[in-house]
């Protein structure tokens, strides 16, 4: 709808994504808020004109499937949208019941669900100290081809926050230590890492490459 595609990305990352999608025949149209879908879903009318389509993907979010569970009968509270209400240790309003994953209304990422598991595991067999408040940097993945995964600060965010950093960026095709993209014939993309110059701590990373959704865990 806006003037820039994927506006939260650093310019160099966005340019790499746009180039990859364009090479694959994807046409990206900006400033095109949709006003109507016509012809049984075969035509999209927008501020940038009309487009004939084979299919229309309507991505308006998700809602929890909790209505049929009769959770109030078990003493489990939900919010106005149907998500299960939990505290920072993922405890519900019912004693001895936890809620993990998308159903508790947190960020709907696989990485968050995995950390939910760690929190509940700590409640059951650990020292019960781990909580959602411990989360510092949560990875995210945009599932395009190849996937685009990120964690921590982008270069733009570091600049806006006045954080000192060193940055390294390299096209995947030029990284000899990553043979898998070459093996699969998918060498599009880049890897970009920000590092604190004083401590060598990784401040953030962007991986636009084959298996990025898995590789990002090595950084996170």
Segments (PLM) and residue ranges:
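Short acidic/polar mixed-charge low-complexity motifs
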Residues: 47-50, 199-201
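Short, surface-exposed charged micro-motifs
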Residues: 36, 75, 89, 192-194
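FAD-site-proximal beta/loop scaffold in flavoenzymes
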Residues: 28, 43, 50-127, 217-218
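Short, acidic, Ser/Thr-enriched surface-loop or helix-capping motifs
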Residues: 23, 79, 86-88, 155, ...
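Flexible, glycine-rich terminal cap/loop adjacent to redox cofactors
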Residues: 143-220
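Short, hinge-like loop/turn segments at secondary-structure boundaries
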Residues: 13-17, 47, 183-186
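Short, hydrophobic/aromatic-rich segments at coil-to-beta transitions
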Residues: 39-44, 164
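Rossmann-like dinucleotide-binding cores of NAD(P)H-dependent redox enzymes
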Residues: 1-40, 108-114, 120-157
């Amino acid at each position: 709808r806006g003037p820039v595609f994927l506006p939260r990305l650093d310019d160099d990352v966005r340019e790499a994504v746009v180039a990859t999608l364009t090479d694959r025949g994807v046409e990206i149209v900006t400033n095109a808020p949709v006003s109507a879908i016509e012809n049984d879903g075969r035509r999209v009318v927008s501020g940038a004109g009309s487009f004939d389509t084979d299919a229309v993907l309507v991505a308006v979010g998700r809602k929890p499937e909790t209505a049929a569970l009769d959770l109030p009968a078990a003493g489990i509270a939900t919010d106005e949208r149907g998500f299960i209400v939990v505290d920072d240790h993922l405890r519900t309003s019912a004693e001895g019941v936890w809620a993990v994953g998308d159903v508790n209304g947190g960020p709907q990422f696989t990485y968050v669900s995995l950390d939910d598991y760690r929190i509940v595991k700590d409640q059951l067999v650990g020292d019960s100290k781990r909580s959602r408040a411990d989360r510092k940097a949560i990875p995210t993945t945009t599932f395009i081809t190849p996937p685009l995964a990120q964690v921590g600060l982008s270069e733009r965010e570091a600049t806006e926050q006045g954080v000192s950093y060193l940055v390294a960026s390299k096209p995947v095709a030029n990284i000899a230590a990553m043979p898998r993209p070459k093996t699969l014939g998918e060498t599009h993309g880049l890897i970009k890492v920000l590092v604190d110059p004083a401590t060598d701590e990784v401040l953030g990373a962007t991986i636009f490459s084959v298996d990025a959704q898995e590789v990002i865990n090595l950084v996170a």
